[in-house]
């Protein structure tokens, strides 16, 4: 039986990925998500946790915008990678 447990553990580690979401204020929130789960789930959870509207912020990975339909597997994310969050810039008037 003990031989089965490491195999299950390896499968779980390969199926899930730990991601960090870093805000502009220096805060970091960690999430565990499946590699093939759309990142919209993480984005919505982050917004709820931080009290933000998803329309007010943008998520980027390696400088590239993240779409809600993207998955960690599609973006070739690795365990402990960081997603950056930026406040949406609103145009000002003179």
From Swiss-Prot:
Q: Keyword Lyase, does the record have it? A: no
Residue(s) of cross-link: Glycyl lysine isopeptide (Gly-Lys) (interchain with K-? in acceptor proteins): 92
Q: Name one Pfam family in it.
A: Rad60-SLD
One CC-aspect GO term? PML body
Q: Which InterPro entries match?
A: Rad60/SUMO-like_dom, Ubiquitin-like_dom, Ubiquitin-like_domsf
Looking at the record, the residues that make up the Ubiquitin-like domain are 15-92
**A GO molecular function held by the record:** ubiquitin-like protein ligase binding
PANTHER family reported in the protein's UniProt record: SMALL UBIQUITIN-RELATED MODIFIER
- Family from the record: Belongs to the ubiquitin family. SUMO subfamily.
- Subunit arrangement? Interacts with sae2 and ube2i. Covalently attached to a number of proteins.
* Protein's name according to its UniProt entry: Small ubiquitin-related modifier 3-like
**Gene that this sequence comes from:** sumo3l
């Amino acid at each position: 039986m003990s031989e089965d447990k490491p195999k299950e553990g390896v499968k779980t580690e390969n199926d899930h990925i730990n991601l960090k979401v870093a805000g502009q204020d220096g805060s970091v929130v960690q999430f565990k998500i499946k590699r093939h789960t759309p990142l919209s789930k993480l984005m919505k959870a982050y917004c709820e946790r931080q009290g933000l509207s998803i329309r007010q912020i943008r998520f980027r990975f390696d400088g590239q915008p993240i779409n809600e339909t993207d998955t960690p597997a599609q973006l070739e994310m690795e365990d402990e990678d960081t997603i950056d969050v930026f406040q949406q810039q609103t145009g000002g008037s003179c």
